[in-house]
Amino acid sequence: MIFTEVGSRAHPTIILLHGGGLSDWSWKGVAEALVERYHVVTPVIDGHGEDGRTEFHSIEDSADKLIRYIQCRLKGKVYAIGGLSIGAQIVCEVLSREPAITEYAIVESALVLPVKGVTVFTAPACGLCYGLIKRRWFSKMQAKTLCVPDEWFERYYRDSLRISKQSLINMIRSNGKYSLKRSIVDTAAKVLILVGEREAGVMRKSASLLHSTLSGSVLYVASGLKHGELSLVYPQQYVGLLEGLFAGRN
């Protein structure tokens, strides 16, 4: 896991974890809006982008690495941790292990209800489709599914070429079988849960489960938006929601 930092360490630290198949560049718009007031850290999750050579193992392993980074480099606590998709699952895992590690948490489109059959069928499915990932036309389709803006497609395509088959298998398995830990109820963080109105039913159910589990949390359903579209396509709106959370307006 590579940790990219912008802004002064004298400012409160916000950590933002990208979604599966993306990288730290996906937070560019959000980071630019925050950098004058915050120290912004955008990790590159194992198996992605510049860290494509490091095999992704699991959400739990990624949470371990993030916790160690915070403990060793950031005095054990940060102002906020946010994440999208698999990045949001990592945030949930961190909250379930370290209740006092952050003041605020932003969980966007986190799947916390296990998908049946994911362990059995992932490897055969990846065996059939892995070669397609290297093809530009297929990456174009995937980019649209992930709501990647057109100006970022070339970066997305280059990064997709770096993902190993085993990392892809591990990511899909870990994402699909992840379930919410009971210990997350002990978190001291104020949590904002985000989900798109046009996301799959299981994603909206996951958001509702998180909201009902976390006392005092705020659930925001982004009208008309799909999976990941809020932070990727509308960074200013995303930042506005963060500022509302920090100010207690949500």
Located regions from the model:
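Conserved HGGG/HGGXW glycine-rich cap/lid loop of the alpha/beta-hydrolase fold
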Residues: 5-52
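Active-site loop/oxyanion-hole signature of alpha/beta-hydrolase fold enzymes
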Residues: 41-82
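Gly/Ala-rich beta-loop-alpha elbow adjacent to hydrolase catalytic centers
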Residues: 83-87, 91
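Flexible "cap/lid" loop of the alpha/beta hydrolase fold
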Residues: 92, 96-97, 102-132
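Conserved alpha/beta-hydrolase catalytic His-Asp/Glu region
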Residues: 117-118, 133-185
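Short beta-strand/loop motif that positions the catalytic acidic residue
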Residues: 187, 193-195
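Conserved alpha/beta-hydrolase "acid-adjacent" motif
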Residues: 200-206
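Catalytic histidine-centered segment of alpha/beta-hydrolase-like enzymes
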Residues: 225-236
